[in-house]
Amino acid sequence: MKIMLFVCGEGLGHTSRCISLAQQMKASGHEVLMGAYGYSKDLIETKGLRTAEMVPEIQLVGDSGSLDIKSSVIATIKSGQFLRIGKVHRMLKDFDPDIVVSDSYYTGIFSAWMRKKPVYLMVNQSNMEEFFMGKSFFMRSLGKITKRFYTMVFRKVDGIIVPDFPMPDTICKYNLDLEKRVLDSVFYSGPLVGKKYREVREAELKRPHVLSTIGGFGYREPLFHKVIETARLDRNINYTLLSGPSIDSDKFTSLPENVTIMKFIEDQFPYLKSSDLVIAPGGHSMMMEALSFGVPILSFPDMGHSEQENNATSLEEEGCGKRLDYSISPKKLLDHIHQLIENDAYKEKAQYLRSLSHALNGPEAITEMIESKYLNQGSQKKS
């Protein structure tokens, strides 16, 4: 079977989960072509996966820890990228897949419909109009148009894949607003994680250990420094901080001995397995990876980013982490770190979700579901 897998490149969470899915599809004997762009495309290619270059659908703009929706819309229109969708259609025509899977990349969905191909939408958010609430009349109107758009998409696709734990443990549940008429087409696959817990060898790290994926660039830089100040308050807790490729880690000349800064980790799963706690933004895929490895999370969602804020709220309600904000003091942050490391209830809930992730096996579950749908469609055509 030939499978086209489109990837939304806004945030590497989409990329990491699509890599996991593509690897499983290849292992199951299918021919897979991934459509991606930017750094997302580069990362996919390092995994040895066949990739075609797509065009971005949206450009995100933010400042001081918040997402600026109006500026993002204006930047997207000015870029003119949406005028190049013909490139996507031509690529789909040349590859001629049997089935299309699109991770929040809607241009790929419309191209699949034009080619009369079965198409499945992978999504962890279906209430995008929240981004436009409380804004100007123009922005609220744009939000209503957006809702009508994706409601139509949800009705017409062949299936909707939610790469999360099934209800009631779904972390992205507050980001889902699905009509009753489409619920039968929704498939909760479980997390899409690149490696299985039992296959990963722990990194040699001093415990207790905190892994922070808060980058040190742009509006997250103040929080990055705040984590370092927190580490100074208790030298018995060890930290690995990911700064991102744009930060020169050599400039940090007076780090406490319990802090290590790294630009990038090629394989972060050994670090996850050796950590007692993760400090992260509110991105869905990072949460799925940490919880699939049984690690509680302190989440700092970007302000004004309703999807991340909802994820963090659900995380706290589920008892596997806490939602915090950028204004927190180092002393208060240390209190939360102690609580999540020392309170068995958080660890037990995270360990339960690790077991559930293993049982669900998201990449394999999606592959088997698509195979079954494809075979059923073939049988129906013959009859």
Language-model features, listed with the residues they occupy:
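C-terminal alpha-helical cap of glycosyltransferases
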Residues: A359-S383
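Conserved nucleotide-sugar phosphate-binding/catalytic loop shared by glycosyltransferases and other
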Residues: G9, A27-S28, V32-G80
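Conserved donor-nucleotide binding/catalytic region of nucleotide-linked donor-dependent transferases
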Residues: K322, S327, K331-L353, L360, ...
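A short, glycine/small-residue-rich beta-strand->loop->alpha-helix junction that serves as a flexible
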Residues: V7-I19, G218-P222
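A nucleotide-sugar donor-handling region in carbohydrate enzymes
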Residues: M139-Y219, L242-I247
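Donor-nucleotide binding loops and adjacent catalytic segments primarily
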Residues: A22, P191-L277, E309
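A donor-sugar binding/catalytic signature common to diverse glycosyltransferases
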Residues: I99-D103, Q268-N310
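Conserved nucleotide-sugar donor-binding subdomain of glycosyltransferases
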Residues: L67-T107
